[in-house]
Structures are given as structure tokens and as C-alpha cells.
Amino acid sequence: MRRPLLGLLAALVVVGAIAGALAWLLNDPKPPTGANHAERLYYAYCVTCHGVDGRGSWRAALFLIRPGELPSAARSRPERYLFDIIKHGGAPLGRPGMPAFGYHLSDADIEALVVYLKTLDRRPAR
């Protein structure tokens, strides 16, 4: 009688650990309080792959994807290039392609995101 209870207890611990890990993995970062429209867009559409600071996220790494480092890309690329990559997607420098967001975001939203991306290199890494 004791052995089946021990097995059941062990199974419950394993299931609880897996559920806790999944809850942690699936918890998306939230924008800071008082975030402007562009920052909220970044958190809604970009942070999963590019991370909070724009330097990539562990979620993308799980799928062996290395998204571009946004602070240096935003600093070195023209705004039109960034706009086009966000709107139409693409595979710059032979990397896996970024999906197109032109169907989800208006041109004004994409322009606001581009302006926000230009501020990432001035933010401390988190």
C-alpha cells in the first residue's frame, strides 16, 4: 500500500513541476507601467523573439533562431529599411526570415515602432 502512494506522490510532483515550468515559459513579459503606444506594440509583437532589450530572447534560441540585434541594426540602418523589414518581412544577411507584420500593423504603427527601435541602444540592458 505504501509503494503505490509513493508512486502517486512522485507523479504529482513531476506533473506540478512540468505545469510550473510551462506557466513560466508561457508568461509573456509585460510592458512597463506608463509605456507609450510604440513600446506597447514592441511588447505585443516583437519581444518574444527580440527580447525586452532588443538583443534576442531565449524563446527564439529554443528554436535555434538568432534574431537580429535591434539596437545596432536600428542605429546603422535607415528608417526606411527597418520599416520595410517590419512591414514585409525578410531574411537579411542569410538569416532565418522575419515574418511580415504589415497585415497586423498599420503604417503609422510601424513608423512608431521604428522610432522606438532607435531608442533601444540608449537603454540599459535588462
Task: State each model region's role.
Residues 1-14:
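N-terminal Sec-pathway targeting helices
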Residues 13-18, 54:
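Hydrophobic core
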Residues 16-43:
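Electrostatic cytochrome c docking/interface patches
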Residues 31-33, 55-56, 119-126:
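Inter-heme linker and motif-flanking segments adjacent to c-type heme-binding CXXCH motifs
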Residues 38, 42-52, 98, 113-117:
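The canonical Cys-X-X-Cys-His
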Residues 39, 51-84, 101-103:
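Gly/Gly-Pro-rich "capping" loops immediately C-terminal to redox-active cysteine motifs
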Residues 62-69, 88-120, 125-126:
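Axial heme c-ligation environment in periplasmic c-type cytochrome domains
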